[in-house]
Amino acid sequence: MRAERVVDGDTFVTSSGSIVRLIGINAPERGRPFYLESKNALKALIEGRLVELDADVQDRDDYGRLLSYAYVGGEMVNARMIEDGFANVFTLPPNLRFAELFLSLERDAIKNGKGLWASSAVTGVKIAGQHFDAREYDEENLNDEYLIISNENDFAFDLTRFLLRDQAGHEFVLSLILPANGEVMVRTGSGVNDNSNYYLGCDDPVWNNDYETAYLWDDEGKLVDLFIFDRGNQHPNP
């Protein structure tokens, strides 16, 4: 079949009318930094061309879209989008056949500052740790699900309009100031912000307890830091 029309950097429509969601990757949504670059990259790879689709454990998502690895001329499009920095890895069990490959490609793209991973001029601001698996039930203890953002500078740092995102694409525009040589716990639930705690105001858990990546972008859409969590193995920015 042919790829008839690209929707965004991780979704396209086939000549038969099927909507295909590429497995293992996530691209910026409309209106977000790098949306057009990502969409155009996928268009250049597949639009109007013959594609071969290959499923994993699940063949459709909750929206009825086909979940697939897409191949054009023998090349896997999912992997190419990650390799070139036009999408981030989206690890979602049980569709994990190429998870390790995708993570390796993403690490290389980050090291080389490709696409999404162009480095910010911001220094000294880090995602320093996480507690994604709250005590008892996550849904009943949202404020025990948190990550830590630290400031290694000798001055307070304004993160207003910085973007915090998980690998699934949940986005939070921040409005907080990091204290000099301090840190802030960014908690999922609601509360009163202070010098040590910042609340996202969510009604449901955000961070995946098994596989997750937290990304922090500056107000120009440049990557400040990321934090990878994989079944208890924590990896700062590679």
Predicted feature descriptions by range:
Residues 1-238:
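Small beta-barrel nucleic-acid-binding modules, primarily SNase/OB-fold domains
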